[in-house]
Swiss-Prot record:
Record organism: Pseudomonas syringae pv. tomato (strain ATCC BAA-871 / DC3000)
NCBIfam families the UniProt entry points to: PRK02166.1
InterPro entries referenced in this protein's UniProt entry, alphabetically: YgfB-like, YgfB-like_sf
GO cellular component: cytosol
Protein name stated in the entry: UPF0149 protein PSPTO_5224
Family as reported in the entry's similarity comment: Belongs to the UPF0149 family.
Alphabetized HAMAP family for the sequence: UPF0149
One Pfam family cited in the UniProt record for this chain: UPF0149
């Protein structure tokens, strides 16, 4: 039985209720891109970039959702296991819809990364990752509803779970290790 209200659908409904035409995937990509480029996790900078994509100042309920999304991303990028979960339609949705959302995610990521990177020098690995994301954003309509299309999509998804981590590691200062409390 498919999930009736996936996180993606719930966020899309919230954005639509506020009159915002942006997809949750593009918004999540924007956040992850700016975070990976070293923008940090302050709410005001995130709200400013999100407002630009939303084209208006977000209402309180959407601001609260944006804070929650940022906290989730911060936990994923700075946690011990460093795992990224992309905000995309579920596997029960048509491949064309999932591929389109993946392309939107890549567009958002590239925009967020570009906004935050400033004059930092990109290494060859970072350039290659960004070129890959730009290519993925362009082929969003090329995947067909077929077993091969599903396989291609899953391979791209595996790459997408790792690519942001490579960029985050390159452009963010490692967290200071917290001293463990001593037992006396």
């Amino acid at each position: 039985m498919p999930i009736q209200n996936s996180p993606y659908k719930a966020f899309a409904t919230l954005l639509n209720s506020g009159g915002h035409k942006v997809s949750p995937a593009e918004l999540h990509g924007l956040l992850l891109g700016r975070s990976c480029a070293g923008a940090g996790f302050d709410n005001e900078g995130w709200f400013a970039d999100a407002s630009m994509l939303l084209e208006t100042e977000p209402q309180d309920n959407i601001r609260a959702a944006l804070v929650g999304l940022q906290e989730m991303v911060k936990g994923e990028l700075t946690g011990d296991d460093m795992t990224v979960v992309l905000l995309l339609p579920g596997d029960d949705e048509p491949l064309t819809e999932r591929a389109a959302a993946l392309g939107q995610w890549c567009q958002g990521f590239l925009a967020g990364f570009g906004l935050a990177i400033g004059d930092k020098v990109l290494g060859s690995e970072a350039k290659a990752v960004l070129e890959d994301l730009a290519a993925i954003a362009q082929v969003q309509d090329a995947l067909e509803e077929s077993e091969d299309g599903e396989t291609d999509y899953m391979e791209v998804m595996e790459y997408m779970r790792v690519a942001p981590l490579l960029l985050f590691t390159e452009f963010n200062e490692p967290a200071e290790p917290q001293p463990k409390p001593s037992l006396h």
